[in-house]
């Protein structure tokens, strides 16, 4: 088995944060990320620190956050040990890059990506470790061309790791980003995986690199194609309404959000994924035959691209 190299993972994640921020700033052309570096105080339940970077009021991006964090603790939170009882009583480290981008233009999809590494150690025993992550796309006015190119990029980056990887991680994404109380997916999916340790460490690490670097390759061409489409109040209102689904998912179902809040994580960083504005409307129904109705009819159930 290849050696576990926590330092190399951390260095990659920090450089990935830098690279993604630079590419998004370049695409936006106006806004820049403002960094909020943070460190946990000694004696807190969770140690460590991170770099939260937030961009606001750009030409294209209304708000976006790209967060790096590296935290450690002596005891796992309940959300983690519930499905992994062997982690109880182990000290742990968790590090990752997580980002959500909320564009202004309703024709530009919202996007999310995350890559992370987790290790739990106990003296005299082998460490328990895994990688997780993925990326997913949430359009409000979808184009088949965009969904296809998003998934093509995902397929291509998965291919060197095995023919089964894309279909498995694509299906996992469809299942994970699903709102049971709405009976709809959050968007058109992408990749999602967790507990990745079935390969040697180096291969798992290489896959994480491919996913992290593949995010901008998948997303920025879509932004470029849609950023100049004209829109009015109707499209903006629908965008804000659909952003409400993002809020519902993150606060009710997202394991990362629950893990962060239960383990005493940094609330501002955990909730940076929230849209700056969202709205709810009682018993909303899209008009038959409208572009809004098409989202519901064609894009909010899992499909092959």
UniProtKB/Swiss-Prot annotation:
Important for dimerization: region residues: 246-281
GO cellular component terms, semicolon-separated: cytoplasm
Compartment(s) of residence: Cytoplasm
Superkingdom of the organism of origin: Bacteria
Primary subcellular site in the record, as a coarse category: cytoplasm
Residues annotated to bind substrate: 98, 114-116, 264-266
UniProt-listed Gene3D superfamilies: Coproporphyrinogen III oxidase, aerobic (3.40.1500.10)
Catalytic activity field: coproporphyrinogen III + O2 + 2 H(+) = protoporphyrinogen IX + 2 CO2 + 2 H2O
Site (Important for dimerization): 181
Binding site for a divalent metal cation: 102, 112, 151, 181
Function: Involved in the heme biosynthesis. Catalyzes the aerobic oxidative decarboxylation of propionate groups of rings A and B of coproporphyrinogen-III to yield the vinyl groups in protoporphyrinogen-IX.
Complex and partners: Homodimer.
Protein name (database record): Oxygen-dependent coproporphyrinogen-III oxidase
Species: Vibrio campbellii (strain ATCC BAA-1116)
